[in-house]
Regions:
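C-terminal catalytic/motor cores of large multi-domain enzyme assemblies
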Residues: 1-311
């Protein structure tokens, strides 16, 4: 054993990149998710040929800047399903030592969604009040996020969110956690670098309507990750994703893909599948609680003309 411990591999380091503020937050939240939450995952695979045909019709005759994206339509489909399944649009507060818990459902559907910004950065943004938005509103909201991101210092935005979360933890008596986070983020060689002096003053002089703020990045009521928008030729499914506490559910969406369809007359044709992955916190929900969501998704794909009413 001692000989094994003394063995060293000759490896050439290509790159060593220490965590920035965005990766720090992701690492912290996902680690907490797997530590605290009993995940249950189910998939729903509606046949999407007619749905995609109607989606194409939706954009006929529209100028490029007016076209509705598939991402916007999928977000609307999910939002309508969440209206019928409010149990998924909720937060949980559970104290394991006392075995006490409470699940709080919300009327507002605020979707946390990872987005690939024009800068190439991945950022999870909070799409507020989706329950009131039409397809056109959702399209405009997504475009506005990209517009404001161009004027935003993402490290500063993430630091503002992290600091606010840390101070909330202090208010709840989490002294050790608060001190540890402050030491980890603001001391040492690899501390988080934020704006200061003139740069900071000039940055915060940009109107909030023209840049992203902590309001845009704060915790939503549920997470939706459209992985298919990142890899449109992906021939696979999202097998699992993290629930971000205190949320009780997360939804992953793949890319439309070819699949064999067995017809009633015994013939087989090529169709399209769009896979929805639904992950829920078993402390808060059982399978029966998410069935209304799954049924709503199925209904929309069976009768896709409804999406024309959502414009």
């Amino acid at each position: 054993m001692k000989g094994v411990l003394r063995m060293k591999q000759s490896l050439t380091v290509r790159k060593a990149e220490h965590f920035g503020i965005n990766r720090k937050i992701i690492a912290n939240m996902t680690a907490q998710s797997w530590h605290d939450i009993p995940h249950v995952v189910v998939t729903n695979e509606p046949e999407a040929s007619d749905f995609l045909k109607v989606f194409k019709e939706l954009n006929e005759g529209r100028a490029k800047q007016d076209k509705i994206t598939l991402n916007a339509v999928i977000l609307k489909v999910i939002t309508e399903a969440l209206k019928k399944c409010p149990a998924m649009n909720a937060h949980i507060n559970f104290k394991p030592r006392l075995v006490r818990g409470c699940v709080t459902e919300f009327d507002e559907i605020n979707i946390s969604m990872p987005m690939l910004l024009d800068s190439g950065e991945m950022m999870t943004v909070n799409l507020h009040n989706m329950q009131d938005k039409s397809l056109t509103d959702i399209r405009d909201t997504l475009a506005d996020v990209q517009r404001r991101a161009k004027n935003s210092n993402m490290s500063q935005v993430m630091y503002d969110v992290s600091l606010n979360d840390t101070l909330q933890g202090l208010a709840k008596g989490k002294l050790i956690q608060t001190v540890s986070r402050l030491i980890g983020s603001k001391t040492g060689k690899y501390r988080v670098k934020t704006l200061s002096g003139k740069q900071k003053k000039e940055y915060y002089g940009i109107p909030e309507r023209d840049r992203l703020t902590k309001h845009d990045i704060e915790q939503g009521t549920i997470t939706v990750s459209n992985l298919g928008s990142l890899y449109k030729d992906w021939d696979g499914i999202c097998a699992l994703l993290e629930i971000i506490p205190p949320q009780v559910a997360a939804i992953g969406v793949g890319a439309p893909r070819d699949t064999a369809i067995a017809n009633p007359d015994g013939t087989v044709t090529v169709g399209k599948k769009l896979v929805f992955t639904v992950v829920f916190d078993h402390r808060a929900l059982d399978m029966g609680d998410v069935v209304p969501f799954l049924k709503s998704i199925d209904e929309t794909f069976k009768h896709p003309e409804v999406i024309k009413e959502w414009i």
